[in-house]
A protein has these predicted regions:
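Nucleotide-activated chemistry modules centered on ATP-dependent adenylation/adenylyltransferase
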Residues: 1-241
Length: 241
């Protein structure tokens, strides 16, 4: 069902590529906020400890939709009813311009956003609000547990997100940068990387992960060549000289 919903929305997006609507491909997975509470009650656990990374804030994703960033927010993502009303209002305008989004996935999309951004998160603590997120320390910890890594990238960040390689290809092709640029920029601000180091990293990380993209599109039963050609033909935010 989730893959069906993603496919419906991806087909809608490909009909009229819009950087502000890429986020809709990830809306359905936000139901994990609901399932976590269910598991917590079933196992009688008193609190949730999360590992969200404060360096991964990416205002540009909603910004492409026209949603102004809140640089003073103290979470990785926006919460609250008023913010969601504004955000979903902008989405609704985009949907009216492309009615293909008005499909069977709509309720799943809206309810997922509710559980993530509107419903109050009780007994919720983020580990990296109290302990600095350091990439070397994180990678060493993962290696100590023999944690599986991706075959097509050295970075361990975002490798668990099946959509990441696809949407970063879209952002890089249509806008000229990806979430790796914002991630590494935040590390520079925190003094974790020099600008020179960051530029070397993003030069590698922004290369298309075709193997992962093909896996993603195969899972959705969509034609890889046709999808890539559609993205490559889409209007760009920059000019190539």
């Amino acid at each position: 069902k989730k893959r069906r919903n993603i496919k419906l929305n991806l087909k809608a997006w490909l009909a009229k590529p819009d950087l502000g609507m890429i986020n809709i491909l990830m809306a359905g997975d936000k139901h994990f906020f609901r399932h976590i509470q269910t598991v917590r009650h079933e196992t009688d656990i008193s609190l949730n400890v999360w590992g969200m990374n404060p360096l991964e804030v990416t205002h540009f994703k909603a910004g492409f939709l026209g949603f102004a960033p809140d640089f003073a927010m103290d979470q990785v993502f926006n919460t609250g009813l008023s913010g969601q009303v504004r955000y979903q209002g902008l989405r609704a305008k985009a949907m009216l311009k492309n009615p293909r989004y008005l499909n069977r996935s709509l309720w799943d999309t809206l309810s997922g956003e509710y559980y993530r951004s509107v419903k109050e998160q009780a007994d919720f603590y983020n580990l990296f609000d109290y302990w600095p997120w350091d990439e070397v320390e994180v990678d060493n910890t993962l290696d100590s547990y023999n944690w599986e890594r991706a075959e097509d990238t050295k970075s361990t960040w975002r490798i668990g997100d099946g959509t990441a390689a696809f949407y970063n290809y879209v952002y890089y092709t249509m806008a000229g940068f990806t979430e790796y640029d914002t991630f590494r920029s935040n590390q520079i601000r925190e003094g974790q990387l020099s600008r020179e180091q960051a530029l070397l990293l993003v030069a590698e990380e922004n290369q298309p992960r075709y193997q992962n993209i093909k896996w993603y599109l195969d899972a959705l039963d969509m034609d890889f060549d046709r999808v890539i050609k559609t993205i490559n033909r889409a209007p760009r935010k920059y000019q190539v000289e």
